[in-house]
UniProtKB/Swiss-Prot annotation:
The lineage of its organism: Bacteria, Pseudomonadati, Chlorobiota, Chlorobiia, Chlorobiales. GO terms for cellular component: plasma membrane. It catalyses: di-trans,octa-cis-undecaprenyl diphosphate + H2O = di-trans,octa-cis-undecaprenyl phosphate + phosphate + H(+). InterPro entries: UppP. Its main location: membrane. The keyword Cell wall biogenesis/degradation applies. This is Undecaprenyl-diphosphatase. The chain crosses the membrane at residues 1-21, 40-60, 85-105, 117-137, 196-216, 229-249, 258-278. It comes from Chlorobium phaeobacteroides (strain DSM 266 / SMG 266 / 2430). Keywords: Antibiotic resistance, Cell inner membrane, Cell membrane, Cell shape, Cell wall biogenesis/degradation, Hydrolase, Membrane, Peptidoglycan synthesis, Transmembrane, Transmembrane helix. The gene is uppP.
Length: 282
């Protein structure tokens, strides 16, 4: 992988990691269209350290408040004393499903599930599921039902969203896409669903990145070019990832996810068309 390719893929990773359009799908598609080598699931996981940094920087106040509350709660012997403390434990419990599924299906995730048929199917299928979630939100708003905010998220929302996050292991599904969808089904506001989605992603993204870095370090370290490429991709992913978070949080305050639903369906259909025309190899 050249330095130029790594920077391009880093930008793509950062821009698409937090939008509900699937960064994995784009990292699978763009190299195929450009005639580049598939960077692989390990590259994606390691570069996510950049987007992880973006979340840490953007939500540093929330993260500090949660960690401080968890520590104080443990020291006082009342681990769920405040909502911030409970939020920390909810994020921890909500992370367990994807960790277990990720380890159980690691081989499939890195091989057969990276087929463009799976990617396009996930793009379209989960777009339709997000559409149904938006319909449910619209129906509840017509009934003047109050929406769940970050201050009122409970164990039900955390556990359900945690299981929904497992679907993000399917390339094309989108981590933010499936967790925001889960949040909308549970009556969370779009902004709150996105915020909780990003906070919930922290432990699993960090663990996955370290896991892949540990298992691929010998290959990476054997080439100065590999280290430079991954470093460049990680830095660009972090910068563009921060901008992507800021955009999505602001956008969802006033808009639905319709634009992302339409984009996913068009992209998924486009991939299938290119495969049928022989322009892409599945």
């Amino acid at each position: 992988m050249t330095l130029f390719e790594s920077i391009v893929l880093g930008v793509v990773q950062g821009l698409t990691e937090f939008l509900p359009v699937s960064s994995t799908a784009h990292l699978r598609i763009i190299p195929a269209l450009a005639g580049w080598e598939d960077p692989g699931a390990a590259f994606t996981a390691v570069v996510q350290l950049g987007t992880l940094a973006a979340v840490l920087i953007y939500f540093y106040k929330d993260i500090y408040a949660i960690l401080a509350a968890v520590i104080q709660g443990i020291m006082k012997g009342r681990p769920f004393d405040t909502h911030e403390a409970a939020m920390g434990w909810m994020i921890a419990v909500g992370t367990l499903p994807i960790v277990i599924c990720g380890l159980l299906f690691k081989t499939e995730i890195e091989t057969s599930l990276r087929s463009l048929y799976w990617v396009s199917g996930a793009l379209i299928g989960f777009a339709l599921l997000l559409l149904v979630a938006e319909w449910s939100v619209k129906k509840r708003l017509k009934q003047n039902m109050s929406m769940t905010s970050m201050d009122t998220i409970g164990w039900k929302e955390a556990i359900f969203t945690g299981f929904a996050q497992c679907l993000a292991l399917i390339p094309g599904a989108s981590r933010s896409g499936v967790t925001i969808t889960g949040g909308l089904f549970l009556n969370m506001s779009r902004e709150s669903a996105a915020r909780f989605s990003f906070l919930l992603s922290l432990p699993s993204v960090f663990a996955a990145a370290l896991f892949e870095l540990y298992h691929t370090w010998d290959i990476i370290a054997s080439s100065a070019g590999s280290i430079a490429a991954i470093t460049a991709a990680t830095i660009t992913a972090g910068i563009t990832g921060y901008l992507s978070i800021a955009f999505l949080i602001s956008y969802l305050k006033k808009h639905t996810t319709s634009i992302f639903i339409i984009y996913r369906i068009i992209l998924g259909a486009g991939i299938l068309s290119l495969i049928a025309a022989g322009r892409l190899q599945p």
